[in-house]
């Protein structure tokens, strides 16, 4: 009997030592009872912890029986500590209270939508961004969000990339970084290649589709992308990321931060290097970037200084390939080609490159005022400078603004030259907002004044076959530009009843733009334009329950033409006007979240792509009178179990020019044609399986429907539909001595589909931008 009791005691003791249990649960907002995605849950002082998923859920497994302390942290909320006596598997529901301590989020809140805003938007948190960040440009990371189509000139996602949302290209998508406009003031486009690997310094991104709420910079005519860079990390950290893959693509990133020093100060730093040969021939990229910040964090005051930027050198791959070349040599790149007397390519100029550097400086000050008010002010300065270099054969001296050269008795009218086309510009100004939050009423009064000043466009000749009396680095064209942009807005969200919320948003914007000089074709230009715009928005949100809401809104937006519209268009361009209706439903439970919305975007004098490019590879646009985009967007995140999650979206749309004039047999006809590069169907899917706690696999699929390369709806000028599948594997190891080792593998285009994601037409000939077939990226992350 004694022996049996001893054996049983030893057995139970051994079982108790070896017993391992799980703690799972959901993190909620105490005020609104909504789940919080991206909250950190730490156990027993482990600084690594886990991060809640899209449904605010977490799982910590393999914990020994006994007492454990959970600490939950989320930006803008007070930390919560929960003690758990673990004797079996435990499931918790923990609510966090909003903190009265000021956080950095107030800097972007003035231009972001929230749960009560009756507009269509999606938030992407840091966890989701980092999962997909293998070193590709930010548009490729956003590829899986609704109504998005992305493209890469080099075909592999590194270098020049583009994004279209609801069929609208980058010139029509407003981008802000910490509330500061990022779109180039003159072209209105965004060049993510100038700030490579900005994703590794990003805390969150909000995409508003349609007009959205008032923001700084050129108005959103398809969508807005609101980027917030890294926020405070209270604990010290260091991180080393290395990645390598197809086309000799390599990425090296180092990040570190001091954590909170003396409960007041914090400093962060990042440097990054990305190189790639590109899928397209010679489409190489050599990219470097940095991010440094220092902040003071008081209970009622936050002051943060940030500088970030990058330098890029990319071999040009701007012109695509024609259909015949696409079928025989899809990686062909004509940029830099040198032709012999017979018209055959005899070689390539080795420095047909784009070389540009951009530095950003931002100072943000946030102050908690008395009562329910806080104030924010930001100053910013951006300096960009660089050139693209090109080899030109048989350029006439007349084109170069020079006299013909006479050698003995022979007069030469042309010469081979190497030119550099420069842009040196500065962008500076300030933004401000006053925010009032009283629970039932949210009021934002804000605005900005920005100046694009001292911008110089000039070209220099660095070599000529026949120079004559040409001086060294002769400037054969030069011009200057300045643009002043002022806006002020008022946004008011107020509860009419417990279930009905009204939203009103009014913005006034004034723009002065002047530019003068000589173009690269020796034509002179002198523009002086002023615009005043009034952009009202109104909407209502109905809370059917704590989990379900309906919203509807109507918004008006106006915007000015860009530089190219004036210089490359055949007639003087007119400002555009957009009326946008949004109707939507959102429902979120612990198992799924779903959103369905209808949109109508009615344009007057929309500037649409003509399908042609200027001599720098930029699309040419023209006013077309009336046009519209209308469609239905569906998106859902479904949690089938703790192991399986499906993130899926689909957009069906009609995009039409209502009175586009087409010449048929020299007779002008008005037709209802499809808008260029606007697919009628876009779908995205991410099916994720948590194979076990530290191993995750995701199957990603993207479908993009047929697109026209001309507004004439010519069936010979089309971009075929494509369906692409990728696979991502992520594995974490938690060894002693480091917080975490992460190993990830990304297989793009698993089925090796030959496709093109972008194109244009020139003189009735289609040109395409082919994308890479099956390719790989592997990444290792060390966290300390």
Task: Locate predicted features.
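Extracytoplasmic beta-strand/coil segments of soluble accessory domains associated
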Residues: 139-181, 203
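Transmembrane beta-barrel wall of Gram-negative outer-membrane proteins
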Residues: 237, 244-275, 280-317, 363-371
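Structural signature of Gram-negative outer-membrane beta-barrels, strongest in the C-terminal barrel
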Residues: 448-450, 476-603, 639-641, 651
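Gram-negative outer-membrane beta-barrel transporters
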Residues: 498, 600-602, 622-711
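C-terminal beta-signal and adjacent terminal beta-strands/loops
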Residues: 646-649, 654-656, 703-709, 731-784
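Short, acidic, small-residue-rich periplasmic hinge/interaction motif at the N-terminus
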Residues: 28, 32, 39-44, 73-77, ...
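Short acidic/polar hinge/loop motifs at secondary-structure boundaries
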Residues: 59-62, 181-209, 228
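Membrane-embedded beta-barrel scaffold of Gram-negative outer-membrane proteins
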Residues: 368, 374-380, 543, 549-557, ...
